[in-house]
Amino acid sequence: MSYSIGIDYGTASGRVFLINTTNGQVVSKFVKPYTHGVIEGELNGLKIPHTYALQNSNDYLEIMEEGISYIVRESKIDPVNIVGIGIDFTSSTIIFTDENLNPVHNLKQFKNNPHAYVKLWKHHGAYKEAEKLYQTAIENNNKWLGHYGYNVSSEWMIPKIMEVMNRAPEIMEKTAYIMEAGDWIVNKLTNKNVRSNCGLGFKAFWEEETGFHYDLFDKVDPKLSKVIQDKVSAPVVNIGEAVGKLDDKMAQKLGLSKDTMVSPFIIDAHASLLGIGSEKDKEMTMVMGTSTCHLMLNEKQHQVPGISGSVKGAIIPELFAYEAGQSAVGDLFEYVAKQAPKSYVDEAANRNMTVFELMNEKIKHQMPGESGLIALDWHNGNRSVLSDSNLTGCIFGLTLQTKHEDIYRAYLEATAFGTKMIMQQYQDWHMEVEKVFACGGIPKKNAVMMDIYTNVLNKKLIVMDSEYAPAIGAAILGAVSGGAHNSINDAVDAMKEPILYEINPEAEKVQRYETLFKAYKALHDIHGYKKANIMKDIQSLRVEG
C-alpha cells in the first residue's frame, strides 16, 4: 500500500492531505487558516493602497511543517510508504527571495515595505504596468497575445515584477530569485531552483517552444528582459514529471523518507480537474471558492478573447488547458453575509444555522426575476471576459421594499450570468461545452445556488463531492511522481472524487433567466465596454482622495 501527500495552498488557508494512491481514500487531513491571513488595508499598522493584497510566506512553511507532522502522526502510516508530494497554489502569487531562497520580506530593513511581501493572486497594484504591457503588445502585433485572450491582467507575474522594478528598486536589488509561491515551496522541499510549466505558461508569458517573450519585454522596459533572465528563468519541469527527491535536511525535518518524490506545482484550480476526473475536451469545470475558475481542455490551441490563457500540457500532457474566471464569488457572498441586518444574524443564531443557510431558505421558493433586481458581480474587477480589474460592482432595481435576501439572490444570479458569458465565449470560439462540472466547497453546501446555475446555463450540472478537489489533484501528481501510477490518467481514474448529485434545468426557469440574462448582458456591455469610464471616474476620486 502506498500513499501520497497533497498540499493545497488557497487564498485564506492551507490544507495537507494524506491520500491512498490505490483508491483515493482520504487517510488524514490538516486544515489551518494562515496566521497572517491576507494582508489588506494596512501592513504592520501602516496604511497600504486598497488595490494591494499581500501575504507572509512564513505562513506557507507553517502549514507544510505542521500539516505533514500531523497527518503522519495521526495516520500512523510508515513514512517509507509515502511515495510522493504534490503542491497546488493560488496563482499568480509571487515571492521575492535571496540566493538561499529566503524571502526578502524577512529582512529587517524591509519589514514595513509592502513590495517585499508575497503579492497574492488578487493583488491589483500593478494595473498601470499591466496596461503598459498590453498596449506595447498591441502596438507591436505580438503573436502570443491571442494565447492570453488578447489581454494582460494585473494579477499576472510580469506586471507585478514591473511594479516592484518601478516602485521599489531597492527590493529588486536585494532579490536573487522571483517565482510563483508554488515553485518556492517545491524548491524548499527539494533544495533546487526550478519552475513549473503550468505557472510560467499561464502567468509569465512563457511558451514551451519559444520560452519567454523577450522581444516584447525589451520594448516594454530595457531592464525587464535582464530581470527575467537573471531572476525568473530556471529549468522547467512539466506537469506529470518529477522534480526530484526530498532534500535530506527537509526529509528529516518533516519526518519523511528522503526517497519521497516531489512533483512540480500546479495552479490550485487546475489541480481540481484532476481531483474530480475531468480529463477530456468538451467539459467545462467551475472551480468555485473565493473566486471561480472556468477550465477546459482541448486538443487545439484556439485564440479566445477574454480568457486568461491556454497552455499545452499544463494539466494533462498533450492537451491544451484553458482558463477563464471571475474574481469575486465566495468573497462576494461573504461580503453580502457580513452586511446582513442584526435581526437576520440573531434569527440564524437562535435557529442554530448560518446566515447563508437562513438566506437560502428565504429565497429558495422565489422564481427568477421575482425581486426585480439585477447586479454586476465586479466587486473585485472582471477577469473574464472583460479583463479589467478596475471595474466595480453595482446593483439595479432597488426599492424601499427590497429585502436583504433579494440582494443576496441577485448576486448569486450575477455570478451565474458571468459564468454564462464565459461559457458562451468558449462556444463562440470553437470550443463546444457538453458537460459542466461544479466543484469546491460552495457547490457542495449551496443547492439553491446550483439550481440557479443549471437554469441560467441551461445545462445539466454535475456537482462533485469535492470540497477539497485541489488537494486531491495535487496528491494525484505526487502519486505519479512517486511511481504509484504510470500516468496522470491512470492516477486520476484510481483517485478521483465521486459525484455528489446531478441537476437538470427546468424549462420555465430557463425562459425567465433568458430575459434576465439579456438585461445582465446589456448592463455588462454598457459598463464594461461603452461607458466603463463611469465606474473608473468614481474610483479615481477614491484613489486620489
Swiss-Prot record:
Alphabetical list of Pfam families matching this protein: FGGY_C (PF02782), FGGY_N (PF00370)
Annotated EC = 2.7.1.16
List the GO biological process terms.
Answer: L-arabinose catabolic process to xylulose 5-phosphate
* Pathways per UniProt: Carbohydrate degradation; L-arabinose degradation via L-ribulose; D-xylulose 5-phosphate from L-arabinose (bacterial route): step 2/3
Q: Name one GO molecular function term.
A: D-ribulokinase activity
**Can you state which reaction this protein catalyses?**
D-ribulose + ATP = D-ribulose 5-phosphate + ADP + H(+); L-ribulose + ATP = L-ribulose 5-phosphate + ADP + H(+)
Principal EC category: transferase
Enumerate the UniProt keywords alphabetically: Arabinose catabolism, ATP-binding, Carbohydrate metabolism, Kinase, Nucleotide-binding, Transferase
Output the Gene Ontology cellular-component terms: cytoplasm
Matching PANTHER family, A to Z?
Answer: FGGY CARBOHYDRATE KINASE DOMAIN-CONTAINING PROTEIN, RIBULOKINASE
What NCBIfam families does the annotation carry?
Answer: PRK04123.1 (NF003154)
For this protein, the record's HAMAP family field holds: Ribulokinase
Family recorded in the similarity comment:
Belongs to the ribulokinase family.
Name of the protein: Ribulokinase
Organism of provenance: Staphylococcus aureus (strain MRSA252)
Q: What is the lineage of its organism?
A: Bacteria, Bacillati, Bacillota, Bacilli, Bacillales
Quick one: which gene encodes this? araB
